[in-house]
């Protein structure tokens, strides 16, 4: 028989047609699970480094305009006026006259039972509410400086007179309250201070960590700052911690940090930690001051009402909740301005996010071992702490198992999330107050809703103005923050090649 020319064998076809293993899996064999044989053991092959396959695009940030923000003194003045208005409303809800009084009764000639009001308590509450305004006034006068010795002396004397007057009024009201009320009622006067001490005095280390670095770009600056951790976070006695916390509490002009668009993953994580500590401190200030204001404005007057005095408990408690929500929104708007939220958004864009995957999925996809010195692109699979994760952001330097990094990215990767939440809260309050105003039949309900609505309209106007301007600003195409990121790739150690 004539011999046929046989073609290449199946084994030769598979060897010549299929690409190399290194091309299929890239850097996965050396940095992850790689390929495995039938026995389950990994096949060790020389593969290129992980960063040869990682080319994340540059992080792009939008440029937002500088929106006007109320000054510290102006905001404290408006906030103090608002608290006085809601305090007056609460006294109307408690001490309004009722219809069953006889005509010849003294209270029937007036709208309020003025003879039942404790004026010492009202003066004490007013002084406590004015503490931030007084300190803001002193701080602004101190920042202005003194042009001459006479001006400096007058400034010192005015500060001394103002603080002495506030202290004297506070002591005078406390002495008279001690004479006319029981010890149980007087305990309500200092209850917020009992919450203040453990809340602020025992958590100063995280605040001191914020002062380690001002978001520097160079590695050497971070190393120098890290060497000073011991000196900044050394143990202090209780009195010094209390004085520092009180100083921070009264100091309302908290500076806004800056964003440096760092290239190193360590610097990005360090910036996120500093911003996270600063954000937690601001939220703590917002919660404490809003609860403090609502407590002294709406709750403390109820504690000193005589047992024979009738008032609408449901309406007074509803007023308490409204005061707390409005104070929370006002303080949040002041302490978390649009520039600060944009700073958090930029840092979250550099941080990235990891999604945890179930075992068994993506078993044939290339996987890598997570490295803290690598910037991971979107969609890459890594293994960390015996778990599989997938990169979700354009840049990903977050620790996959760190829940605080995931929460930070969730809150701030959308720049308008905080602003939309505040608008939703304030809008819901205004809609409910309008509904209550339409349904109200008593004069005190109508007056209280009308006065509070005027204050809420101003807050909602500022929020909607910022939302419209920022919404249009973020809709424009982003610009690359640093052209060096597109020209100089990163090595496996996080440095420029």
UniProtKB/Swiss-Prot annotation:
UniProt GO BP: autophagy; negative regulation of autophagosome assembly; negative regulation of autophagosome maturation; positive regulation of viral genome replication
Name recorded for this polypeptide: Transmembrane protein 39A
Organism: Rattus norvegicus (Rat)
Membrane spanning residue stretches: 72-92, 110-130, 155-175, 182-202, 285-305, 317-337, 418-438, 444-464
Main subcellular location: endoplasmic reticulum
Keywords tagged on the record: Autophagy, Endoplasmic reticulum, Glycoprotein, Membrane, Transmembrane, Transmembrane helix
Keyword NAD attached: no
Domain of life: Eukaryota
UniProt-annotated glycosylation sites, renumbered to this chain: 31, 39, 251
Membrane topology: Multi-pass membrane protein
Source lineage: Eukaryota, Metazoa, Chordata, Craniata, Vertebrata
Compartments, as annotated in UniProt: Endoplasmic reticulum membrane
GO cellular component, one term: endoplasmic reticulum membrane
Subunit structure: Interacts with SACM1L, SEC23A and SEC24A.
Family membership noted in the UniProt record: Belongs to the TMEM39 family.
Function per UniProt: Regulates autophagy by controlling the spatial distribution and levels of the intracellular phosphatidylinositol 4-phosphate (PtdIns(4)P) pools. Modulates (PtdIns(4)P) levels by regulating the ER-to-Golgi trafficking of the phosphatidylinositide phosphatase SACM1L.
């Amino acid at each position: 028989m004539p011999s046929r020319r046989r073609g290449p064998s199946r084994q030769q076809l598979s060897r010549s047609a299929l690409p190399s293993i290194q091309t299929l899996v890239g850097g996965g064999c050396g940095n992850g699970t790689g390929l495995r044989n039938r026995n389950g053991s990994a096949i060790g092959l020389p593969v290129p480094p992980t960063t040869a396959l990682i080319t994340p695009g540059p992080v792009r940030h939008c440029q937002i305009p500088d929106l006007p923000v109320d000054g510290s003194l102006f905001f404290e003045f408006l906030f103090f006026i608002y608290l006085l208005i809601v305090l007056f409303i609460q006294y109307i809800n408690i001490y309004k006259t009722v219809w069953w009084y006889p005509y010849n009764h003294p209270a029937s000639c007036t709208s309020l039972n003025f003879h039942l009001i404790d004026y010492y308590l009202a003066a004490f509450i007013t002084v406590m509410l004015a503490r931030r305004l007084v300190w803001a006034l002193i701080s602004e006068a101190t920042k202005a400086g003194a042009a001459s010795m006479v001006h400096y002396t007058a400034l010192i004397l005015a500060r001394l007179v103002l603080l002495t007057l506030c202290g004297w009024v506070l002591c005078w009201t406390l002495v008279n309250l001690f004479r006319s009320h029981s010890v149980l009622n007087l305990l309500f006067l200092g209850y917020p201070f009992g919450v203040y001490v453990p809340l602020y005095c025992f958590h100063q280390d995280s605040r001191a960590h914020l002062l380690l670095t001002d978001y520097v770009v160079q590695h050497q600056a971070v190393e120098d700052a890290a060497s000073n951790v011991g000196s900044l976070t050394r143990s202090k006695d209780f009195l010094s911690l209390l004085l520092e916390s009180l100083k921070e509490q009264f100091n309302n002009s908290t500076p806004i940090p800056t964003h440096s668009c760092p290239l190193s993953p360590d610097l990005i994580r360090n910036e996120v930690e500093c911003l996270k500590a600063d954000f937690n401190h601001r939220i703590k200030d917002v919660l404490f001051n809003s609860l403090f204001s609502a407590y002294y404005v709406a709750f403390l007057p109820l504690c000193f009402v005589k047992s024979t005095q009738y008032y609408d408990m449901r309406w007074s408690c509803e007023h308490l909740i409204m005061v707390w929500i409005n104070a929370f929104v006002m303080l949040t708007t002041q302490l978390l301005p649009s520039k600060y939220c944009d700073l958090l958004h930029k840092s979250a864009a550099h941080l990235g996010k990891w999604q945890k995957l179930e075992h068994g999925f993506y078993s044939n996809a290339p996987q890598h071992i997570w490295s803290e010195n690598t910037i991971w692109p979107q969609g890459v699979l890594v293994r960390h702490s015996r778990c599989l994760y997938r990169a979700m952001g354009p840049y990903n330097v977050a620790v996959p198992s760190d829940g605080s990094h995931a929460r930070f990215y969730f809150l701030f990767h959308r720049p308008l999330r905080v602003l939309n939440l505040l608008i939703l809260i304030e809008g819901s309050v205004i809609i409910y107050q309008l509904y209550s105003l339409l349904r109200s039949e008593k004069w005190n309900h109508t007056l209280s809703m009308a006065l509070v609505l005027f204050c809420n309209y101003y807050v909602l106007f500022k929020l909607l103005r910022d939302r419209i301007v920022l919404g249009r600003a973020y809709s424009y195409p982003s610009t690359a923050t640093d052209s060096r990121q597109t020209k100089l790739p990163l090595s496996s150690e996080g440095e420029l090649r």
